[in-house]
């Protein structure tokens, strides 16, 4: 089989056609601290400056060999655009931590109605993201770009004072303003997603980070998660763009709701999920990605050797590869502390073990 471009390879696997090899997809915070320090930037500079963000994101493909670009590389874009304030805390020896919310836009239920859907071409750091996507698309037309939107409940936690703790309480109380806030965050994500698509993104990825199995029930997931993600999925699906869904922690109790309710093109699994179970039960209905451990179990991507990473990746490839519909990826974000040599090992494993005959 002739060698495919990253775009051809990624689309083939997503649509259950046979690629030349398993694609390697990096997502969620795929800017590593090592590279930021090597470039002598702080995270505040990277996240607010188009040229510097471009330099860091570009390395996902040019340095590590991933089959995609992924941005934003932090989770606070929508929350900041909706009015929350960020601080960038210095950490001795570590450059700069990612931005953290220091002042929330919504303190009382009445605050929700004071906030308008932000214009992605003007609000916060959204224009920076759009500028970088346009530049990546122009320079690397054969490398797919995944634009990222926060899951609506996660954005709520970035704008609601009290974050998840208060969100869970308001959910239990069936507070109507939470649905109003979820709708505002959903429409913000839709507007941002459409702008990223117009700029050149070929897919929209999302994550559900706070609505995990240890915190919410399937009934709550069905009420507070599924309908809002489905609205995003439908909005971008109408443009012919796939929705890529990642559920943090153990997605097992929610999988039927995700597959049948949200209907994403692909689900990227955390390493808490049995990939063999997921492939056997859902692998003919949706494409899957995963799930080399980065945060739980042995966290091999974070703490293992390159050889251990390759061995773990080989096991995932052997499960996911048959019949196509599979991307090799980490079980959660390739965050900024992951050793560069381990990211390269993940990519190398696909070249050695993921070639289709």
PLM ranges: what are they?
Residues 56-87:
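Glycine-rich, N-terminal phosphate-binding loop and its surrounding beta-alpha-beta segment
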Residues 44-55, 62-64:
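Short, structured active-site "lid" loops
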Residues 106-113:
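Residues forming anionic-ligand binding surfaces in small-molecule and nucleic-acid pockets
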Residues 1-39, 43, 56, 67, ...:
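Active-site loop segments of alpha/beta catalytic cores
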